[in-house]
Regions:
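Structural recognition of an alpha-helix C-terminal capping motif at a helix-to-coil junction
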Residues: 22, 35-42, 55-67
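Short, charged helix-capping/linker segments at alpha-helix termini
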Residues: 2-10, 21-39, 49-52
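Arg/Lys-rich amphipathic alpha helix in sigma70-family domain 2
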Residues: 52, 66-76
Length: 76
């Protein structure tokens, strides 16, 4: 099971990282964008027992980026 999660996680990262980074950069600028995207992927890794890689994963990723960006901007 763990090997399967790692393979799926790597594929997810390769598929979505560039687009998420572009989106985050548009929201918060280059300085904070990479940190936000990495935070989202770290959170997925930490919650691997409860994460489901279904049809809604793309929406989940982009919504997570948006939420983290808004929270960051609120606290600046």
């Amino acid at each position: 099971m763990r090997g399967n999660f790692e393979d799926t996680y790597k594929a997810l990262f390769r598929r979505y990282y560039a687009g998420l980074l572009f989106y985050a950069t548009r929201l918060v600028g280059e300085d904070d964008a990479e940190d936000i995207v990495q935070d989202v992927f770290v959170e997925i890794w930490r919650r691997q027992d409860s994460v489901e890689f279904g049809e809604q994963i793309q929406a989940f990723l982009y919504r997570s980026i948006y939420t983290k960006a808004i929270n960051l901007l609120k606290h600046k």
